[in-house]
Amino acid sequence: MLFRSARARKQVGPDGMVMFDAHCALPPPFLIQLAGAIQAYDVTYIEEPAVPGNIEVFKRIKQHVKIPLAVGEQARTIWDIIPYLQERIAEFVQIDLAHTGGISQMLKMATLGEVHQAALAPHSVTSDLGMSANLQVSASVPLFLIQEYYPSITPKDLIRKSWDVDKDGYASLPTTPGLGCEINEARLEEISRTPSKPEWPTRGRLKDGSISDY
C-alpha cells in the first residue's frame, strides 16, 4: 500500500488528489498504523475505514488518524450517517444513490453533511442511468468535492446519455429531460431474454477463490 500510495502521488503530481479505500477490510490497529505511514503522500481521505455500525470503533480510529475520514457508502437513510456527523468523525460523506432512497434521500444526506461541514464525494459503481442521477445531485450540492466514476458497465446500446466525461475527468451535466438518458426498450427486452454470467462488480469472488463483495 505504501508503494501504491507513492506511485499514485507521483502520477497525479502535487495538485492531484490521492484517496485510500480501506474497504472495511483492515483491523483498527493495522489501519491506524497504515494511515500514519501514508500520511506523507498527502492523502485526501481514507474511505470506509471500518465496518459501519460500531461508532466506538470509528471514534478510536479518528482519535489516532490525522487523515480525514470518508463514510456513508453503505448508508441507506439519514439515520445511518447522523452519528458520524454529530461525533465529528466524517469529513466527507460518500453517499451512494443506488443504496439510498434515490435522489430525495441523497439530497437530505448531503444537506446534513453540509450542516456539519462534511463535503459530498458520492460513491458510484453503477450504470449510465445511475451516474446520470448522481450528476444531477452532485451539481446541486454547494459543498461538493468529487464524483466517483467508472467507465460504463451498462450493456452496449442500452442507454443513450446526454453527458460525457472528458480525458481530464471532468463531467458535463445531462441536458435532456428527466435524468438525461434515453433507454432503448427493444435492447432492454433483448437483454432480459438472454441469460448471462454476472460481470464485475457482482462477481463475488477474487482470483484466489476468496469471497468478496467486489
Task: Please tell me what each predicted stretch does.
Residues M1-F3, A8, S192, T202:
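Short, intrinsically disordered low-complexity segments
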Residues F3-V65:
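Metal-dependent enolase-superfamily TIM-barrel catalytic cores that perform enediolate-based chemistry
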Residues R9-V12, D42, S138-P142, S192-P195:
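Structural signal for hydrophobic packing residues in well-ordered secondary-structure cores
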Residues I159-Y214:
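C-terminal extensions of enzymes
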